[in-house]
Amino acid sequence: MFLPTLNKTFKFLTLSAGLFLSSNWAQANEFYNHPNYFAFKQKAMTTYGLSSEQIDAAMSGARNLPNILNIMTRPGESKPWYQYRSMFLVEGTIQRGVRFKNEYEDVLNRAEQQYGVPKAVILGILGVETGYGANKGSFITRDALATLAFGYPRRADYFSDELAALISWTYKEGYPTNSIVGSYAGAIGYPQFMPSNIQKLGVDYDGNGHIDLRNSAADAIGSIANYLAQYGWERDRPIGFPARYSGNNPDSIIAKDLTQPTPYGELKRLGITPVNPLVKIDDLDLVNVIQLQDQFGSIYYITYPNFQVITTYNKSRMYATAVWLLGTEVASR
């Protein structure tokens, strides 16, 4: 009779301890009673093999950040290209990029050789995203993602998945989940990767056994190169060229969808040509034309599929152009 009684007592104490811990987590987790919290846990458990206890522990102390919702719902301000460009193509950022390039030249060259992605493009992304690590964000990533997962219905599924990916990644790497900081939308480190992309495309490029995009510039360089390669970067192919347009119907040449390029010969007949007469483009090359607004009117670029690959990082054509031009300037110095 003694052993069964002891077993029952042990089970009762274990259950009580679990309930006590869950109660403490519930009190410290502002999202515990949200109607979607259970479904979030179930999906995270199925997708990543996490336990209920691991998820509750990772979410312990999670706080709602209303200012993030204010940022997300604030109407976006559309800047013309010449104003957007001035946010990144400035001497201070360029000089910071040159110092970064000089410090990590060997790593940049290794990534270019391995993945076929020019170091200029890697440098451009690092400069536009975080100013070469100067501004990686200051929001607790767990709280930012939880706020959006449970308080921003329009993209709740996306941010819920990213929150689960964050918890999984931090357990794998041994980081406290609440120690990760980043942007208000949950992007992390030098390259501002979302947690799911860290899991899928992050690279341990310094060989220390961890993918640490917050502190390892080498990991950031390798991860950006791997990302672009996986999204279709074409080795030894151009990004694009400045162009001039001699026609009077720009809508006929501007790309509506960068994934559907046009043979250059067709666009040339409509009046688009490279600014530099020494640039030769084969009539069969598949290219797009983009239009941006400078102080003095429209400017044009003929872009190759590699330009479209940059837009998978951020869909803005101005973003991709800033990456291209900033990186080219930094790499040339």
Which residues does each predicted region cover?
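Bacterial N-terminal signal peptides that target proteins for export
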Residues: 2-13
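Bacterial N-terminal signal peptides
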Residues: 11-22
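Sec/Tat signal peptide C-region and signal peptidase I cleavage site
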Residues: 24-28
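An acidic, Gly/Ser/Thr/Pro-rich helix-cap/linker signature
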Residues: 29-103, 109-112
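Solvent-exposed loop/turn segments at secondary-structure junctions
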Residues: 63, 129-133, 187, 246, ...
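Acidic/His-rich structured neighborhood in mature extracellular/periplasmic domains
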Residues: 86-223, 229
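Flexible, glycine-rich surface segments
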Residues: 177, 181-295
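C-terminal functional modules
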Residues: 284-333
